[in-house]
Amino acid sequence: MRRIDFRFAELRANGRKALIPFITAGDPSLEATVPVMHALVRAGADVIELGVPFSDPMADGPTIQRSSERALGRGAGLAYVLEAVHEFRREDAATPVVLMGYLNPIEIHGTRRFAEAAVAAGVDGLLLVDLPPEEADETRAIFTEVGLALIALASPTTSEQRLDMLCSTAQGYLYYVSFAGVTGASNLLDTHAASDRLRQLRQRAGAPVVAGFGIKDAASAAAMAVDADGVVVGSALVAALAEADDVRSARERAEAFLAPLRQALDQA
């Protein structure tokens, strides 16, 4: 959690926006995950969101669903994800890593047992897509005790009552879903409506606010970052990595995809 707080404080002090790439652990291969994470940092990533493969990713569009299926087919379960973070930490002790996934694998593992293992591996936060904020108190308490941030999600359809709850309990950063849909549906992105909401959230939230869903290139990243503390890019990056033939190709694709977004954010 402290790595996330430090990174956003550092960015704020330098007048920069956070660039947060999402990749699925285990895709395009088990061997590529950690090298791709390092490549993303070289290309300008400030935080890495690492997707935990799940058999029923309801919030994800076809690109990430297929990515998750491929990763599961290779055996990329929760243990693999934590080992990947542990390996990443051998060379990078500074870049925050947030796991994004669903409740079921964690509940099977045991929430406290998982949380302790995640911290030991070097994880900084969790974004649990299907954990309602009204039911998050126990999980948040366990995570806070061990030093994990429970990242919250808000969307255009989130009620004012729920927004008040999310803003008052936000840890790490608040992830604003720029439209009501699944990941990758960039045709639904309305930057004007999202910008209005982002400005409101930044005034209310006790943590930085980042925007995700529908960000696919440098132009959309720069547009969304104007009124946010950072942006998350996922499906477009996952699609680019899916075409990689080997680890070297995956690294090169990761850097080639992310570097223009970093440049656009720094010039905006």
UniProtKB/Swiss-Prot annotation:
- The record's EC number reads 4.2.1.20
Q: Which residues cross the membrane?
A: none
CDD domains according to UniProt: Tryptophan_synthase_alpha
Broad class of enzyme this protein falls into: lyase
Name the residues annotated as catalytic in the UniProt entry.
Answer: 49, 60
Q: Which UniProt keywords apply?
A: Amino-acid biosynthesis, Aromatic amino acid biosynthesis, Lyase, Tryptophan biosynthesis
Fetch the Pfam families from UniProt: Trp_syntA (PF00290)
Looking up Gene3D superfamilies in the UniProt record yields: Aldolase class I
**MF (Gene Ontology):** tryptophan synthase activity
Pathway listed: Amino-acid biosynthesis; L-tryptophan biosynthesis; L-tryptophan from chorismate: step 5/5
What reaction gets catalysed by this protein? (1S,2R)-1-C-(indol-3-yl)glycerol 3-phosphate + L-serine = D-glyceraldehyde 3-phosphate + L-tryptophan + H2O
Any one GO CC term of the record? cytosol
Q: Which NCBIfam families match?
A: trpA (TIGR00262)
**What family does the database annotate?**
Belongs to the TrpA family.
Subunit info here reads:
Tetramer of two alpha and two beta chains.
Q: What does this protein do?
A: The alpha subunit is responsible for the aldol cleavage of indoleglycerol phosphate to indole and glyceraldehyde 3-phosphate.
The name under which this protein is listed is: Tryptophan synthase alpha chain
Species in which this protein is naturally found: Xanthomonas oryzae pv. oryzae (strain KACC10331 / KXO85)
Q: Which gene encodes it?
A: trpA
